Structures are given as structure tokens and as C-alpha cells.
Regions:
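Short solvent-exposed loop/turn micro-motifs enriched in small/polar/acidic residues
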Residues: 47-49, 113-115, 125, 133-135
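A structural detector for beta-sheet-dominated domains
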Residues: 40-46, 68, 135, 155, ...
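N-terminal leader/targeting segments and the immediate start of mature chains
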Residues: 2-62, 94-95, 174-208
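Gly/Pro-enriched, hydrophobic low-complexity segments
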Residues: 125-188
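An acidic-aromatic
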Residues: 50-110, 138-140, 149-164
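Short acidic, Pro/Gly- and aromatic-enriched capping/linker segments at domain boundaries
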Residues: 105-123, 164-165, 170
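Short, hydrophobic/aromatic-rich segments at coil-to-beta transitions
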Residues: 31-42, 59-66, 124-133, 145-151
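Residue-level signal for mature regions of secreted extracellular proteins and peptides
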Residues: 90-92, 122, 175
Length: 208
């Protein structure tokens, strides 16, 4: 059930800016993420709706998405990512879990700055936003006044609307621990419905 991250777009950090993408001197620069934050997201993936809590903790090298799909009896679904390149995807209600060694860590706070292309100012639901695109992977909307993220549009068609953004919020350490069945020999039960509403928007890709 791969989703956001979380390691998210890390491979993009290594991409140099193309010559045509060099920002003009008067173009604004994306605001780096704060080292720690909590964002509530409304996700729309081709009509499949979900709510997500995104916990970003750069100092501790971890990123967590807690996702609740519309009217899902087995919510929530967890996507925990670590800076050592390990991710865990699990649904406690089903006791399902799988892990992935993606080989890269979580996004750096300034992940959007190198290689992004400024697209200008646009309205996003009543918010006046600066807009950047990066590597045909994401279009990023940032509020001009507050410099906080407003909307993310991924290459898969997934749209994340940022409903709240708490700078400095930190989740308790116990909430980051993957359940014990993630570490058993079979890694938990196989999930019969891995594809429901998921895409790879938040999973780093080796080739872009």
C-alpha cells in the first residue's frame, strides 16, 4: 500500500537545476519546511477521498502519515519513514504490515529549493499563492502572505489540500513505533486490498 513518504521525493534533491529552469533574480524562492511540523491534509485521488495527518520530524530523521479513507472500517493506515531508508506500511485493524528498504531518507527541509521552476502566482481556493513545479513530479502552492503550503498536486493526479499547518508540533515517541507484527518472520498478514486508493506519489523513484 505505498503512499507519501513521507521518504517522499528525496531523489529529487539530487537533481541539478536545468539551464532553462534557472530562476530570474526577482523570482521568489520556496520557503523551506520547518524542522518539525504537523499538517492535516484532505487528499483527493481521482475521487477517492482521505484525511491524513502528516508528522514531519527532521531532527529525529522521521516522517509519519496517518491516513483515514472515507468510510473505511479499517482506518487508519500508517506510513512511517525513517532517515535510514526504511519505511513501514501497516494497518492495525487488519494486523497487516510490510516494510521497504528504499535506500534514501526523508525529505530535507529545503527539498523544493534546488531545481524547482517558478510558475507565477495563482489563486488556490481563495488563497493568493506562489507556485513552483519540480521535475514534473509535484506542483507546489505556497500562500504569499503566510508562506505556508496550501496545496500539492502530484504527477499521479493526487491532490493534497493543506487544512492546517502547525509549526513545531511533535508527535510522542511511542506513536512512531511500528507494531510488533511488522518484525515477525512473515511481517504480518498479507493485505488483500493493497491497491485501494493508493498511488506512489509519496514514494521516491530512482529514475525521473
Amino acid at each position: 500500500m505505498p503512499l507519501l513518504p513521507v521518504a517522499l521525493l528525496v531523489v529529487l534533491l539530487c537533481l541539478p537545476a536545468a539551464p532553462h529552469a534557472a530562476a530570474a533574480e526577482d523570482d521568489p524562492t520556496p520557503t523551506p519546511w520547518p524542522p518539525q511540523f504537523h499538517a492535516k491534509l484532505l487528499m483527493d485521488y481521482h475521487g477517492n477521498l482521505s484525511l491524513a495527518d502528516l508528522w514531519y520530524d527532521w531532527p529525529r530523521g522521521r516522517n509519519l502519515h496517518v491516513i483515514r479513507y472515507q468510510l473505511a472500517a479499517d482506518a487508519p493506515y500508517y506510513d512511517a519513514e525513517w532517515n535510514n531508508g526504511t519505511s513501514f506500511f501497516y494497518t492495525p485493524a487488519r494486523r497487516t504490515c510490510r516494510s521497504a528498504a528504499v535506500g534514501v531518507g526523508i525529505l530535507r527541509p529545503d527539498w523544493l529549493v534546488p531545481g524547482s521552476v517558478y510558475l507565477g502566482r495563482r489563486d488556490a481556493g481563495g488563497f493568493d499563492c506562489h507556485v513552483w513545479a519540480k521535475a514534473d513530479f509535484i506542483t507546489y502552492y505556497e500562500d504569499v502572505r503566510t508562506k505556508r503550503p496550501v496545496k500539492w498536486v502530484f504527477y499521479t493526479g493526487r491532490i493534497a489540500y493543506v487544512m492546517s499547518f502547525e509549526v513545531g508540533a511533535v508527535l510522542e515517541d511511542a506513536e512512531w513505533q511500528a507494531p510488533e507484527y511488522c518484525f515477525t518472520k512473515d511481517g504480518g498478514l498479507p493485505d488483500p486490498d493493497l491497491s485501494r486508493g493508493h498511488d506512489e506519489s509519496f514514494i521516491p523513484r530512482s529514475v525521473l
